[in-house]
Amino acid sequence: MSNTNNVWLAGFKLTSVNFYDIYPANSKKYDFPKYWKIFESREKTADPKLLEIKKMYKEDRLELSGAGRYFFKTEHLPDSLWVESSNTKLPPSSEYIFKVRSGGVVLTQACAQLLQQFRLGESTLTPVQIYDLETQQLCSEETFYFLNLCERREYLRDLESDGMLVSFMTDEKAVQYSVRGDIKSGQLLVDQSVQNCELDLWHDPLLMGHVFVSDALHDALVQVNMDSQWEMVSCQLV
């Protein structure tokens, strides 16, 4: 971390990170271009083998969605991204983070290369390119990176102190919190032991849908004008 040892709360919110109708797929495991309409229930089949493959595909997609929402490690990562046709809207070059189907978070190469200079632990960035399902050709030569952010650490303190967070019980009977409104700078309390954290990017399982960013990574993102989509606010160390 940098000399100020600050910590920043961030979230891949739809207010700053746009969703695009893009399918993540693993071409080594499924022939997605050939069978995607069956996988996505656009076409029916009575073929037992295809029905079994469709079932596995759905299970993998469900796990991928859970990994993005709850920040756990998954082996079912895509090696390609697919759009239905050349008319499908693609992210503009000004967006360095975007979301795809299954809740996947995808970064541009420039943003991914910056993150790779920092301590990500077991979190991974998998290279993918976008293809057209109609032509099975690349939509562009650009390489993107699919983020599997799976590192978890617990540093949050006094979560019920001022009513900004709402508690609820998860399916696993664990207490978790969601944000009520917007968190202001310095409002969220984080244990000062976070200064010894060996990571620059992690999720705290107590707080749903958010990640934490070290001062060093925050400063690097700001320096290259890649901070706005993260919507980072500083925390207060206690």
Residue ranges and their predicted role:
Residues Y96, L201-H203:
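A short acidic-Thr-Gly-centered motif at the start of a beta-strand
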Residues T108-Q109, V211-D215, L221:
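Short coil/turn motifs at helix boundaries and re-entrant loops, enriched in small/polar
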Residues S2-H76:
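A structured, charge-rich N-terminal accessory region that forms the first stable segment of a protein
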Residues D60-F98:
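Long, hydrophobic/aromatic-enriched structural stretches that serve as scaffold segments
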Residues Q137-L201:
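Aromatic/basic-lined ligand-recognition segments
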Residues P205-M208:
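Acidic/histidine-enriched, beta-strand-rich ligand/metal-binding domains
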Residues T124-E134, D227-V238:
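Short glycine-rich, low-complexity/disordered patches
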Residues W82-E154:
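Aromatic- and glycine-enriched beta-alpha-beta binding-site module
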